[in-house]
């Protein structure tokens, strides 16, 4: 990969070999902790193939139209990196079999005549569901949600009328990331923060 395509990523990611069927000029990385494992790939794309920078609503609407039953939208954001490059990203969660959750990041960063596509897959590893259960029990004890129907626990972050698939739950709010730093969603958001602040 030539220098202009390089994106600074956290140093705890290990470089991996790419496969022949991977996109041209791609680089792959992996990372594993006690609670998550990650596979990440970066490669250049044409700017016209990038998500629309600055237009979060178009991305949200597109994802809502494409989600499968076992998936849910967690986050869509756009902005400018420290080095004044436009970026936009989405995080979608997907149910793993037999248990656990995968958080899929798609992030585009505008370079000049092209964009970099970052695709990462952070999976729950070890004991799954710990974050959800801990926060759910806390909220039940505080009277914020009530069994058995758990009204308000599951909610699309951008459209409360959207009910399809596996909706985001309250434990996935960013405010709980610090309590579960090795959870795959926390790892995903920390990765995004690093990329925005170091590119």
Each language-model region and where it sits:
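Context-gated lysine
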Residues: 15, 31, 37, 57, ...
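Secretory pathway targeting signatures of secreted, lumenal, and periplasmic proteins
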Residues: 3-61, 65, 95-101, 105-107
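Surface-exposed amphipathic alpha-helical segments
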Residues: 2-16, 122-199
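Generic detector of well-ordered alpha-helical segments enriched in charged/polar residues
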Residues: 56-68, 189-196
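Signature of long, low-cysteine stretches enriched in small and polar/charged residues
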Residues: 31, 62-116, 120-129, 133
């Amino acid at each position: 990969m030539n220098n202009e395509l390089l994106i600074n990523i956290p140093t705890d990611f290990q470089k991996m070999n790419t496969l022949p069927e991977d996109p041209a000029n791609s680089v792959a990385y992996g990372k594993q902790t006690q609670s998550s494992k990650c596979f990440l790939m970066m490669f250049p794309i044409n700017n016209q193939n990038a998500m629309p920078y600055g237009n979060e609503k178009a991305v949200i609407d597109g994802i809502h139209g494409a989600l499968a039953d076992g998936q849910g939208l967690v986050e869509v954001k756009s902005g400018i990196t420290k080095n004044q490059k436009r970026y936009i990203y989405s995080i979608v969660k997907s149910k793993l079999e037999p248990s656990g959750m995968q958080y899929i990041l798609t992030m585009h960063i505008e370079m000049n005549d092209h964009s970099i596509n970052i695709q990462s897959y952070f999976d729950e590893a070890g004991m799954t569901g710990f974050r959800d259960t801990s926060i759910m029990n806390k909220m039940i004890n505080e009277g914020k949600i009530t069994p058995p129907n758990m009204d308000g626990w599951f909610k699309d972050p951008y459209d409360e009328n959207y009910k399809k698939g596996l909706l985001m739950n309250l434990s996935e709010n960013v405010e709980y990331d610090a309590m579960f730093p090795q959870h795959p969603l926390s790892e995903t958001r920390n990765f995004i923060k690093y990329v925005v602040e170091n590119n």
